[in-house]
């Protein structure tokens, strides 16, 4: 019996304009991991010292997120989740000192730890605080710290995952992201020989599906 998902992955890998060749194999991609890690270390240090400030614009976080948003099409618009929305007063990590410290603790834990258990535990801790406007878009920061543990996240990736698996994952909730993450890990294990232990590869496949470049197998 033909494995339609395997055929899709092979076609995607051979597509010069797909995310596998245009982003995942891009030489600059790996260099950006180092600079993003250093940038997040600065964010953590500033929050701990009380010098981060109360605005996104001009902050060390803006610098990091901007460099992520420049990671070609898969991360285009990654900054939207962190932009201050004054009418909604979200994400509530700029004006609320306790929330800002909790956000810094999440990043600090994920910078220092190396295990899936610690990363997921840190996510549960930040989720328990129910900080307005601070959802799984943060996973795009964590991906650059732990690419084998945390898949990237955006609307197109969720759409692609739902199309490929028949799931109904929703945006904006950490528990939904973590459930999708488990499904992504299983998919990645099944097709590991064609993908990578770096979850950016399967994230790119799902992005291309969700953005309409490919149609999910029936």
Where are these regions (language model features)?
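An N-terminal alpha-helical hairpin/helix-loop-helix interaction module that forms a charged
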Residues: 1-131, 147-218
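Small-residue hinge/turn detector
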Residues: 134-135
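Conserved beta-strand->loop/alpha-helix structural units within folded catalytic cores of enzymes
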Residues: 138-141
């Amino acid at each position: 019996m033909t494995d339609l998902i395997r055929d899709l992955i092979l076609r995607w890998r051979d597509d010069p304009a797909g995310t596998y060749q245009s982003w995942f194999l891009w030489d600059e991609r790996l260099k950006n991991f180092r600079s993003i890690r250093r940038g997040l270390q600065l964010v953590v240090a500033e929050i701990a010292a009380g010098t981060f400030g109360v605005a996104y614009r001009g902050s060390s976080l803006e610098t990091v997120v901007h460099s992520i948003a420049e990671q070609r099409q898969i991360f285009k618009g990654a900054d939207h989740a962190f932009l201050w929305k004054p009418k909604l007063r979200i994400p509530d990590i700029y004006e609320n000192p306790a929330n800002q410290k909790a956000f810094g603790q999440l990043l600090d834990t994920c910078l220092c730890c190396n295990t899936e258990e610690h990363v997921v535990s840190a996510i549960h801790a930040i989720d328990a605080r129910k900080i307005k406007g601070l959802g799984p878009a943060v996973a795009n920061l964590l991906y650059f710290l732990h690419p084998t543990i945390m898949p990237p996240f955006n609307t197109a990736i969720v759409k692609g995952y739902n199309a490929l698996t028949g799931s109904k994952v929703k945006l904006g909730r950490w528990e939904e992201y973590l459930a999708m993450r488990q499904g992504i890990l299983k998919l990645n294990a099944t097709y590991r020989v064609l993908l990578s232990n770096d979850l950016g590869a399967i994230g790119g496949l799902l992005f291309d599906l969700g953005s309409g470049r490919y149609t999910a197998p029936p």
